[in-house]
């Protein structure tokens, strides 16, 4: 808690699709809302009152309210592919998060915000300026999302309390594979995958449009999201899975009844192959597009192989899943199996090429799934910000006033306060 006010720190994780916010020490975020803002249309007619200087800056909505007002307001996403792109909208978004949702006085709470890997130092400076000058917070810590996700995995029974591991963070807009050694991100080995939740939704929508003419066009994306979140899973073998559906359609294909939100007429649709074809994009991306062809298990293996040799064993042993797009049933099992195959094949080839002279030590591959996986980044931040040491490593308002925003270019790594 804040040594001065005795109040817990505020933890905000701004993702591409959703923002998670709440107070340190809690297991779950207090609010989860879309990272969307609806501002007054510049083309639309403004009332006489709103034309007064500055009033239009207050006329905006965020989250679900923004979506509800999307017909009369311009709706934008301030965060794209994990990076903040519109700082004016981001400041407005944080304003509503703090005052409307959390209903707190920012002067009384330390703040923990999250950032993607390889975030530009200038972005940290912009964040510091907004937090210290607009909100007048007493202290700020900007944590790397992957490190927080690694800490959150400690809740798993199979996890060791180590800050060495490989984090696969897959949300709505982007998927990162991030190796971490003793709390430090190995930046040169980070890899990005242009496949995430939004791409799976679009692919499922495309399949269902071709097969289900009953689905109203206006409903197709929401139905695709529902299928992705409620019915999808990862299969061990795509060819065998097609055979199961063809031989026993009544067992595997589900019929869903729904209602058109516009006409209120009922309609129904079948959920079939897309149940496993959506998540299959991670393991066989060529089924949707020829633009990107590298499966996730190969990216994970290549990432670890590009790291210093003395930390690779620990990176294979602790592969941690984070984000909503890793929540598919059996996602971890399939990933562990495929990565293990690559590792075992390489070891076998090494022995063959040495003529049997080199006997490699077996390498453990372990993929960690846990209960806090969906909101792992926020939960890791909640754990960190609830420790007394957290307040010792935060950048304070006094330091900011003395030195300036450049103090936030660097943050003490979580490993230093473990």
Curated annotation (Swiss-Prot):
One of its GO terms (biological process) is response to mercury ion. GO terms for molecular function: actin filament binding; ATP binding. SUPFAM superfamilies: Actin-like ATPase domain (SSF53067). Keywords: Acetylation, Actin-binding, ATP-binding, Cell projection, Cytoplasm, Cytoskeleton, Nucleotide-binding, Stress response. Pfam families: Actin (PF00022). It is found in: Cytoplasm, Cytoskeleton; Cytoplasm, Cytosol; Cytoplasm, Cell cortex; Cell projection, Pseudopodium. GO terms for cellular component: actin cytoskeleton; Arp2/3 protein complex; cell leading edge; cell pole; cell projection; clathrin-coated pit; cortical actin cytoskeleton; cytosol. The modification N-acetylmethionine is found at residue 1. InterPro entries: Actin (IPR004000), Actin/actin-like_CS (IPR020902), ATPase_NBD (IPR043129). Induction: By starvation. CDD domains: ASKHA_NBD_Arp3-like (cd10221). Its main location: cytoplasm. Belongs to the actin family. ARP3 subfamily. PANTHER family: ACTIN. Functions as ATP-binding component of the Arp2/3 complex which is involved in regulation of actin polymerization and together with an activating nucleation-promoting factor (NPF) mediates the formation of branched actin networks. Seems to contact the pointed end of the daughter actin filament. The Arp2/3 complex is involved in organizing the actin system in cell motility and chemotaxis, in phagocytosis and macropinocytosis, at late steps of endosome processing, and in mitosis. Component of the Arp2/3 complex composed of arpB/Arp2, arpC/Arp3, arcA/p41-arc, arcB/p34-arc, arcC/p21-arc, arcD/p20-arc and arcE/p16-arc. Interacts with carmil (via the region between the LRR domain and COOH-terminal proline-rich domain); carmil is required for Arp2/3-dependent actin nucleation. Arp2/3 complex, MyoB, MyoC, and the alpha and beta subunits of capping protein all form a larger complex with carmil. This is Actin-related protein 3. It comes from Dictyostelium discoideum. The lineage of its organism: Eukaryota, Amoebozoa, Evosea, Eumycetozoa, Dictyostelia. The gene is arpC.
């Amino acid at each position: 808690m804040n040594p001065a006010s005795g109040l817990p720190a505020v933890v905000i994780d701004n993702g591409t699709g959703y923002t998670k916010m709440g107070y340190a020490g809690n297991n779950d975020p207090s609010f989860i809302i879309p990272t969307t803002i609806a501002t007054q249309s510049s083309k639309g007619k403004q009332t006489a009152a709103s034309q007064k200087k500055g009033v239009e800056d207050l006329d905006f909505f965020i989250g679900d309210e923004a979506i509800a007002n999307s017909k009369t307001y311009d709706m934008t996403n301030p965060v794209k592919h994990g990076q903040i792109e519109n700082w004016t909208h981001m400041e407005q978004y944080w304003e509503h998060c703090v005052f409307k949702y959390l209903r707190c006085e920012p002067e009384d709470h330390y703040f923990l915000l999250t950032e993607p890997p390889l975030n530009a130092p200038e972005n940290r400076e912009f964040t510091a300026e907004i937090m210290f000058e607009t909100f007048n917070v007493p202290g700020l810590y900007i944590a790397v999302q992957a490190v927080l996700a690694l800490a959150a995995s400690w809740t798993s029974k199979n996890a060791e309390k180590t800050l060495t591991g490989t984090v696969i963070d897959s949300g709505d807009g982007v998927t990162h594979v991030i190796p971490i050694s003793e709390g430090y991100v190995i930046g040169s080995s980070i890899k990005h995958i242009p496949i995430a939740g939004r791409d799976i939704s679009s692919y499922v929508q495309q399949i269902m449009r071709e097969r289900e003419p009953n689905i109203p066009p206006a409903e197709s994306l929401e139905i695709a999201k529902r299928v992705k979140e409620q019915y999808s899973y990862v299969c061990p073998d795509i060819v065998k899975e097609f055979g199961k559906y063809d031989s026993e359609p009544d067992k595997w294909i589900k019929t869903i009844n729904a209602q058109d939100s516009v006409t209120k007429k009922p309609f129904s649709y079948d959920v079939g192959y897309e149940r496993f074809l959506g998540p299959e994009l991670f393991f066989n991306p060529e089924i949707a597009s020829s633009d990107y062809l590298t499966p996730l298990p190969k990216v994970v293996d290549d990432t670890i192989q590009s790291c210093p040799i003395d930390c690779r064993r620990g990176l294979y042993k602790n592969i941690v899943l984070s984000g909503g797009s890793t929540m598919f049933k059996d996602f971890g099992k399939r990933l562990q199996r495929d990565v293990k195959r690559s590792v075992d094949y390489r070891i076998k080839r090494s022995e063959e090429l040495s003529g049997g002279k080199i006997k490699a030590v077996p390498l453990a591959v372990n993929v960690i799934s846990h209960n806090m996986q969906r909101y792992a980044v926020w939960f890791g931040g909640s754990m960190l910000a609830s420790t007394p040491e957290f307040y010792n490593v935060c950048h304070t308002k006094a330091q900011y006033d003395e030195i300036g925003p450049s103090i936030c270019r660097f943050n003490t790594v979580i490993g230093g306060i473990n």
